[in-house]
A protein has these predicted regions:
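Charge-dense, intrinsically disordered terminal/linker segments
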Residues: 1-33
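Generic alpha-helical structural context detector
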Residues: 12-15, 171, 214
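N-terminal beta1-alpha1-beta2 submodule of the flavodoxin-like/Rossmannoid cofactor-binding fold
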Residues: 20-155, 159-178, 242-273
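Ligand-binding pocket scaffold of soluble enzyme catalytic domains
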Residues: 36-39, 48-50, 195-197, 225-237
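A generic structural signal for short coil/turn motifs at secondary-structure boundaries
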Residues: 55-59, 203, 236
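Extracellular serine-dependent O-acyl
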Residues: 84-90, 223-231
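Short Gly/Pro-enriched loop/turn and capping motifs at secondary-structure junctions
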Residues: 98, 201-203, 233
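Short, glycine-/small-residue-rich phosphate/pyrophosphate-handling segment
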Residues: 163-165, 182-228
Length: 273
C-alpha cells in the first residue's frame, strides 16, 4: 500500500467512524460493543481471533461473517494496539488427543516444546502437532497470545454450539491449561484477560457464551465479564424461514450500530487481499 492509498484509507475510516457515532441505537448489542471497545482501549496489546468462515461465490459481492465484522470494527476502533488473526485462513490441524493416552497425559510436556526460536521465542509453545506436522500454524497464535494483555475470540453459533474452527482452536490450546493443572507448572495466561463474542440465528447463543466463559476460567484466563456476549437474530428456535435469514444481516447492523459503509469498506479490503 502506497502513501496515497494509506491516506485515503484513513480518510474513509474517519468518515465511517464518524457516521457510526451518529444516531446510535439503544440496544443491548450496541451497548455491549461499546463497552467491549472501552475495556480494550485500556490495554497495551489486544489479540482478536476471528473463527467464522464464509465462502465467496461472487468477488463483487463479498460476504463477511457477522462475528468477523464485530472483530474488524473493534480492530479499527483500537488501532495499533490490535493484532487481528483470521483463524479460518490458517492451517490449524486437529488435536492429536495426547491428553488422554492409555499411558497417561502427555499433552504439553517438555518433550513437545517447539524448538524453532523464531516460532517459539518464549519457549512456552509445547504442542506435539507442531513437531509431528511442521506445516501447522498454531505457533503463530501462541506467539501473539503470550505477548498480549487481552484476547477475544469471535465465532458463529452452529447447531447450538460454538463452530468447528473455534472448537478446534480451543482443543489445540489444551497444552496451556494442561501445563498448570496436570503438570503442576506455572499458569502462563493468568494475567491475560479473555473474552468471547458470538453471533447466531435462532438458538442457544447465551448458553454458548456461558459455556465458553466457564471453559476460559478452566483454562486459567483472567475473565473480563465485559468481553463476553452474543448477538442472536431471534429467540424463536423454530424460526427457520428464508425471510428471517434474509432479514438477519440488516438487523445485525441495526442492533450493533455498525454502518453499511463500514461493511462495504471491509468488503473492498477483503477483495484486495
Amino acid at each position: 500500500m502506497n502513501l496515497q492509498e494509506e491516506l485515503n484509507r484513513i480518510k474513509d475510516m474517519m468518515r465511517i467512524v464518524s457516521e457510526s457515532k451518529d444516531d446510535s441505537p439503544n440496544t443491548a448489542s450496541f451497548r455491549n460493543l461499546k463497552k467491549t471497545i472501552d475495556e480494550l482501549k485500556k490495554k497495551k496489546k489486544v489479540l482478536l481471533l476471528s473463527c467464522s468462515n464464509r465462502y465467496q461465490f461472487d468477488d463483487n459481492n463479498i460476504d463477511i461473517p457477522k462475528s468477523r465484522l464485530i472483530a474488524l470494527y473493534i480492530k479499527e476502533e483500537l488501532g495499533d494496539i490490535v493484532e487481528f488473526m483470521d483463524v479460518t485462513e490458517m492451517k490449524i490441524l486437529p488435536c492429536e488427543g495426547n491428553v488422554s493416552r492409555k499411558d497417561g497425559n502427555s499433552c504439553g510436556i517438555l518433550k513437545a516444546m517447539l524448538k524453532d526460536k523464531s516460532k517459539n521465542p518464549s519457549g512456552f509453545h509445547r504442542c506435539w502437532v507442531n513437531i509431528n506436522e511442521p506445516s501447522d500454524e498454531l505457533w503463530k497464535i501462541s506467539k501473539e497470545l503470550f505477548e498480549s494483555d487481552a484476547v477475544v475470540f469471535f465465532s458463529s453459533v452452529r447447531w447450538g454450539q460454538a463452530n468447528m474452527y473455534y472448537q478446534n482452536l480451543m482443543e489445540r490450546l489444551t497444552w496451556i491449561q494442561n501445563r498448570h493443572t496436570t503438570l503442576g507448572e506455572s499458569n502462563l495466561i493468568k494475567n491475560i484477560e479473555s473474552g468471547y463474542i458470538c453471533t447466531g440465528q435462532n438458538w442457544n447463543g447465551n448458553n454458548v457464551v456461558d459455556t465458553q466463559k466457564e471453559s476460559h476460567e478452566y483454562y486459567g484466563f483472567k475473565i473480563n465479564d465485559s468481553l463476553y456476549w452474543n448477538w442472536q437474530y431471534t429467540k424463536d428456535s423454530y424460526d427457520e424461514t428464508q425471510k428471517s435469514y434474509k432479514e438477519s444481516h440488516k438487523k445485525f447492523l441495526k442492533d450493533t450500530g455498525i454502518k453499511e459503509s463500514f461493511v462495504e469498506y471491509q468488503s473492498k479490503d477483503t477483495k484486495k487481499s
